[in-house]
Amino acid sequence: MPVFKGSCVAIVTPFTENGVNFDKLGELIEWHIKEGTDAILICGTTGEASTMTDEEQKEAIKFTVEKVAKRIPVIAGTGSNNTAHAIELSEYAQSVGADALLVITPYYNKTTQKGLVAHFTEIARHVDIPIIIYNVPSRTSLNMLPETYLEVKKKAENVVGVKEASGDISQIAEIARIMGKSFEIYSGNDDQVIPIMSLGGLGVISVTANIIPAKIHEMTTAYLNGDIEKARDMQLELNPLNKALFIETNPIPVKTAMNLMGFGVGPLRLPLVEMSEKNLEYLKSVLRQYGLLKEEN
């Protein structure tokens, strides 16, 4: 069985000035389950994991697992450019009941493809739950090549798939060809969900689902149920919104949008800062077009 099919929200982390707002996080989790979200990723890029302490990350993972209470899968972001640190977070996530892990390729230290094999194999050796690799070269300055997944899989059976955010459809097609249907491919880009699903992808780990979870669930479910035309039409309809949510570095626009829409998810953490006035006005105009923001806002 795959970790999930359909829409997994890369959920934002609500903050107060003093820490994680667990009351608000709990509200968001309940809302996502009600809206049909198929899985929740906690402590991903969109959740600002890079500016959370280890203690905050662990508390957020534990809280999410307990709040969800097995109603849908919980995927914990446990990646690091320090293999030992990734192992520590991964072991913790498994110990509190996470269903799977999302582990980003190492960033900044720019290892080789051989190093990627060693990194993921070593993490996988310390846990039993499924691991989804996260390939996002625009953030890491490192691209995991299709043949490297095969080398990892030979040594680590619990590496089950990839969140592919390279934007390179040819590369994703090659991963699908080399790895076969048992290897789970998830879109890491909201504007490429249906193209990737057409190559055998099972869904998306989504930023946009933070504000329209029911729509992203509906789109992916349509494709999975064979209604290709509906899924395609929804992808095209939503792409201007997807674009607006990446007009500045993620998660600046999506968190701003959520606050504009009344979700009250609190501030960004430095070094992320508020949007420029020009981009803010553009975001507002797009949200209004989709009926997500009242005209007076």
Curated annotation (Swiss-Prot):
GO terms for molecular function: 4-hydroxy-tetrahydrodipicolinate synthase activity. Transmembrane segments: none annotated. This is 4-hydroxy-tetrahydrodipicolinate synthase. It comes from Caldanaerobacter subterraneus subsp. tengcongensis (strain DSM 15242 / JCM 11007 / NBRC 100824 / MB4). It is found in: Cytoplasm. NCBIfam families: dapA. Pfam families: DHDPS. The gene is dapA. One of its GO terms (cellular component) is cytosol. InterPro entries: Aldolase_TIM (IPR013785), DapA (IPR005263), DapA-like (IPR002220), Schiff_base-form_aldolases_AS (IPR020625), Schiff_base-form_aldolases_CS (IPR020624). SMART domains: DHDPS. Keywords: Amino-acid biosynthesis, Cytoplasm, Diaminopimelate biosynthesis, Lyase, Lysine biosynthesis, Schiff base. The record marks 45, 108 as: Part of a proton relay during catalysis. The active site is at residues 134, 163.
